[in-house]
Every structure is written in structure tokens, then in C-alpha cells.
Amino acid sequence: MMQFSRPGNFKSSAYICATLALASFAGTVAAQNTTSKMEGMQLSNDQPIAIESDQLEIRDQERKAYFTGNVKVVQGTTTLQAGKMTVLYKGEGSSLTSGDANIDKIFVDNQVFLNSGTQKATADHGEFDMAAQTFILSGKQVVLSQEKNVFTGCKLTVLMNTGEAKLESCGGPVRIMLDPKSQKKQ
């Protein structure tokens, strides 16, 4: 078991961050559909990625890494914040610290916040499944916003390979607040 404490800027975790940033928030749901295409987020592979947390614990034998306390992932204008992030990876002899880990799933919990320019998302939980190419934001209330346009539900599922997205309700309707002035800016 390996433990690291703040500050943490781990270049070997670049794949984790790129996947998190790309999958986590690709845009906002269009019009009044609960199923829609999401605009792809533009990330540069040549931009540095920084991860910091109060503590990092790597358990290579279990193929798990735990980032806990004030987790912050930044690449360019995209920022992910959460109370904790758990990374599951696979591959015999692979190691997160050497950069050869094959990421299987990533879980983020405790006040998940994503911000990319004018686009923002908040949730209680997030899950990335690399094999299924899906990302799910869930919780008591998932809020997506772009400028004054706001979409609220309890579960957002994004198919990373197609950009398809579905926002599900909390037992009642999915709520959408659209600002007609935002259409004129685009």
C-alpha cells in the first residue's frame, strides 16, 4: 500500500483526468427532451492535467486508488471537484504510479462539481465505466446549466462514444428552465 498526502500533482494519472473531464460533462441537454445528443467537450491531449487531494492511497495489489478530501482535477478550462474519487484499474502487474494502469471504473462522490467554461454540473455521485463507455451522474438532484439554461433531474446517463444523453426525473418531471436570450448568443 502506498500513501501520498497533499499536494498531489500526478502526471501518471493523466489518463484518469482526461477520461474524467471528457466523460463527465460534455454539454447541456438541448430543448425539452430527456434524451438528447450532448456537444463534445474539446480537450487537448497536450494540456497538463493536475490532480490534487488531501490524501492519495494506492493499493496496487487490489488495483485501486483512493483520492480523498478536497479532490480537484484540472485540465485547461475543465475542473472536476469532489469529496472523494476511487479509481479501479486492471491488468496483471499494472501500477497507477508507473502510468501503465488500464482504468476500468472511476467513482466520484460527495458534492461532485464539474465546470467547463459556461457549462456546469452538480451531483452527489458520478460513475465512469470505461468498458461500457458510459458516465452516470446521480443523486438527490442533478443540475446541469449553461449560462441561464438549467436542467434538473436525478440521473444523467451519457454514452461517451456517441454523445447520447438521458436525464431522468426524481419521480416527478424533469425540470428545464430555458432563457430565450441564450439562443441569440449562439
Protein language model annotation of sequence segments:
Residues 1-186:
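Mature-chain termini and adjacent capping regions
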